[in-house]
Amino acid sequence: MMAAAGLESAWEYLITHFSEFQLASIGTFLLHESVFFLSGLPSLLFERLGLFSKYKIQKKSNTPDYQNRCVVRLVLYHVCVNLPLTILSYRTFKFMGLRSTLPLPHWTVVVSQVLFFFVLEDFIFYWGHRALHTKWLYQHVHSVHHEYATPFGLTSEYAHPAEILFLGFATVAGPALTGPHLFTLWVWMVLRVLETVEAHSGYHFPWSPSNFLPLYGGAEFHDYHHRVLYTKSGNYSSTFIYMDWLFGTDKDYRKTKALEEKERTKHL
């Protein structure tokens, strides 16, 4: 109850001092940037400093210059593409029912809507991502994202502007359909950013979510997608693995994992 009261007080401060447009556009952008860079920078530093190397999925590492190139382009993309899109999308979300007033939605509403967003996003993302691995779309659009065959957290949003628009639809489809409270939208965005950063981190730790959450892909699952030739990579899902399992696009990954496990047990 105290936590809920604290959230309500903090939210009241925000809606008193800022307009809904400011919160939904600039506030959303600043929250995204904060969560993205704060969660993405650690894996960059781990790789650069050689920390936690026993948990690194690939032995290869990106050079500091190659890492810096990613960061500079990300800032450019975010300011020139993401920020204008966030500002321009406010009217659309408002039309679809976005609100920011008190009271905040009950936690059961937040949880159920966010779960729906994850499931819907995963379904749309799978087919969109799979389409991006067709020859023409890969060569002209998706190859930008795959410039980093050894991913680290920040590479999760390193992509061609057309891909940002194309796959970004999967992320906003759920909120656009339900017209959620801005608070719910922020919870969804934070969790989705943390998920994609972890999936691109390049590290699999004992505490990684995939060790505890059924059907969750995680870093190992997506790292394979980056290091294999684009026509054979599979593993197209964003968060969960059931779509790849249903359509057989994870078969090569599972074979590789089985062989790696066999080799590992040989040396025990």
From Swiss-Prot:
GO MF term list: aldehyde oxygenase (deformylating) activity; C-4 methylsterol oxidase activity; iron ion binding
Catalyzed reactions: a long-chain fatty aldehyde + 2 NADPH + O2 + H(+) = a long-chain alkane + formate + 2 NADP(+) + H2O
Pfam name, any one: FA_hydroxylase
Entry-linked InterPro entries: Fatty_acid_hydroxylase, Sterol_Desaturase_Related
Tissue spec. comment: Expressed ubiquitously.
GO BP annotations, alphabetical order: 4-alpha-methyl-delta7-sterol oxidation; sterol biosynthetic process
Keyword Transmembrane assigned: yes
Annotated compartments: Endoplasmic reticulum membrane
Domain Fatty acid hydroxylase: 114-249
Leading EC class: lyase
Biological role: Aldehyde decarbonylase involved in the conversion of aldehydes to alkanes. Core component of a very-long-chain alkane synthesis complex.
Descriptive protein name: Very-long-chain aldehyde decarbonylase GL1-8
Lineage of producing organism: Eukaryota, Viridiplantae, Streptophyta, Embryophyta, Tracheophyta
